[in-house]
UniProtKB/Swiss-Prot annotation:
Principal localisation: cytoplasm
An annotated GO cellular component: cytoplasm
Complexes and interactors: (Microbial infection) Interacts with hepatitis C virus protein E1; this interaction prevents E1 interaction with E2 and subsequently inhibits viral infection.
GN (gene name): NEURL3
Start and end residues, zinc fingers (RING-type): 202-241
Protein name: E3 ubiquitin-protein ligase NEURL3
A GO BP annotation: innate immune response
Induction: By hepatitis C virus.
Record keywords: Cytoplasm, Host-virus interaction, Immunity, Innate immunity, Metal-binding, Transferase, Ubl conjugation pathway, Zinc, Zinc-finger
Record carries keyword Zinc-finger: yes
Metal-binding in keyword set: yes
Length: 262
């Protein structure tokens, strides 16, 4: 498929946070500036993405499902590959991780069970020293997705933003606290966010309209959904790193954080 194995890759890669590889991605994938969010623009395929470095045995790859899209069958696929994404010929990437990339290269992946990749879900997956691919969704039980992953050479994480899964975000599993599933998801479903016109997209999801202001810095590059997510997770503006004290419509009074128990 035009890709090659790069076995000289250092299996003991620096312990930098995982990001998506900036170049090796499906034709429909758009990444944010940090390389942490992958959004599939159209169709239900061509959503393959890779980690930017090899993943150690037992290392958890943590991600969150940011958005779903109805009308398709099937969703997120996850796994590992011996393909160094730096050596992948992007035009030759197939539209599907399962089974296309598996059949064309040393790649081992699986489909998450139905109902295990919903908007707001936290997904962790890893391979152990016996070559077993596991996943865990939120606080659920460990799931054995498949066996027989060879572990004698460097392995990169590979994901497919497929079907009903529209956007995912890589998280840092070593952080002191992983974010909980987003409590504002139901309210967002009740009041759908408007789709953006070209040039007015949210800087995080690249889909909804940038209609929300962060207080006090005043940056307005985000939709309501993503602004509240950032407020809950880090409370720091992604643009200027100022502390966020409130979230407001682009025009209107600020909405303050709701404290637990209030």
């Amino acid at each position: 498929m035009g890709a090659q194995l790069c076995f000289e890759a250092n299996a003991k890669a620096p312990r930098e946070a995982l990001r998506f590889h900036a170049e090796a991605k499906g034709a429909q994938v758009r990444l944010d500036t940090r390389g942490c969010i992958a959004h599939r623009r159209t169709t239900f395929h061509d959503g393959i993405v890779f980690s930017q470095r090899p993943v150690r045995l037992g290392e958890r790859v943590a991600l969150r499902v940011l958005r779903e899209e109805s009308g398709w069958c099937g969703g997120l696929r996850v796994g590992f590959t011996r393909l160094d994404p730096a050596c992948v010929s992007v035009p030759s990437l197939p539209p599907f991780l399962c089974p296309d990339l598996e059949e064309q290269s040393p790649t081992w992946a699986a489909v998450l069970p139905e109902g295990c990749a919903l908007t707001g879900d936290l997904v962790r997956f890893w391979v152990d020293r016996r070559g077993c691919l596991f996943a865990k969704v939120n606080a659920g039980c460990r799931l054995l997705l498949r066996e027989g992953v060879p572990v004698g050479a460097p392995l990169w994480a590979v994901m497919d933003v497929y079907g009903t899964t529209k956007a995912i975000e890589l998280l840092d599993p070593t952080a002191s606290r992983l974010p909980t599933p987003m409590p504002w998801d139901l309210s967002n479903k009740a009041v759908p966010e408007p789709k953006a016109t070209p040039g007015e997209e949210c800087a995080i999801c690249f889909y909804h309209a940038a209609n929300t202001r962060l207080v006090p810095c005043g940056h307005t590059y985000f939709c309501r959904y993503c602004a509240w997510r950032v407020f809950s997770d880090t409370a720091k503006c992604p643009v200027c790193r100022w502390q966020i004290e409130a979230v407001a419509p682009a025009q209107g009074p600020p909405a303050l954080r709701v404290e637990e128990g209030s």
